């Protein structure tokens, strides 16, 4: 499955547009990750635990979107948009939403 943020795939013209496909993943903030992230922020480092969690959530959302596209008979998803939203009381959760257009290319 080809997946891109661009509206076209060079050398692979779109033969048919199948519709919008989406994927979502929600992760909860862990108190230990928060503690270590705060310490890292104080000393100027990166919050690796959060970065891994974000990457995992993004992969889950992308896989969900690809699965929807396959069910429609697509061989590619173009125009992918990735959004991040903070949710929940005290901003305790993070949602990753992805969307794109399922297509059949040559």
UniProtKB/Swiss-Prot annotation:
Pfam families: YbjQ_1
InterPro entries documented for this protein: UPF0145_dom_sf, UPF0145_YbjQ-like
PANTHER family named among the record's database cross-references: UPF0145 PROTEIN YBJQ
Record family assignment: Belongs to the UPF0145 family.
Family annotation (NCBIfam families): PRK02877.1
Name of the protein: UPF0145 protein azo0572
Species this protein is from: Azoarcus sp. (strain BH72)
């Amino acid at each position: 499955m080809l997946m891109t943020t661009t509206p076209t795939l060079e050398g692979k013209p779109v033969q048919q547009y199948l519709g919008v496909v989406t994927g979502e993943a929600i992760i909860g903030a862990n108190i230990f990750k928060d503690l270590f992230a705060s310490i890292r922020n104080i000393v100027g480092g990166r919050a690796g635990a959060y970065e891994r969690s974000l990457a995992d959530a993004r992969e889950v959302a992308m896989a969900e979107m690809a699965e929807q596209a396959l069910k429609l008979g697509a061989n590619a998803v173009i125009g992918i948009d990735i959004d991040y939203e903070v949710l929940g009381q005290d901003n305790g959760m993070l949602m990753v939403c992805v969307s794109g257009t399922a297509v059949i290319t040559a």
